[in-house]
């Protein structure tokens, strides 16, 4: 276990893995570390945005860069090139109110993944994105919702933010178990041919419709659902 924002710790983990695999190529690297921050543009701090980006994007960069040789950039290693699997989110394609920091990190991860996927054709290292919808993990429970909403007692967004936080709880209840993501990741590593991106989302149809509607209509639908009313 190591902190993906600590570049030294990431490099130390490479040594541990190298001792295990010897001169073989590493079959796969799964970048799953992530966290979520909720709040309005008025209240979120630059530090919160930075921490969100450091974990969800720079952490992935550190790991991808550090493990490249083991995955196949070192041509002296034996075996087939490995695969990089980056766990993104449907929040990497649909921006939601009060999740701008999280959206930023996941949109960034999607662009990073697409860029290096094309670069790493040089070594035959495939890069695949898994984009989950709601998953039964405590990613949003780490936010003390009562305290967070209390911060907005005198804000126009108080009621809307409270509703958004309740929605995250409901989404977790209908979410897939984490094992579904783990099984997909293992399947990708074991398969010769894969798609570049897999969306695993129990609310798939709802999100597809949001993307099909004109942006202004989707904006109004989301605003109504979250009680974001101009005052």
Give the positions of each predicted feature.
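Active-site loop immediately N-terminal to the catalytic Tyr-X3-Lys motif
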Residues: 42, 94-100
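The beta1-alpha1 cofactor-binding region of Rossmann-like NAD(H)/NADP(H)-dependent oxidoreductases
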Residues: 1-12, 46
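Active-site helix of classical SDR
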Residues: 64, 105
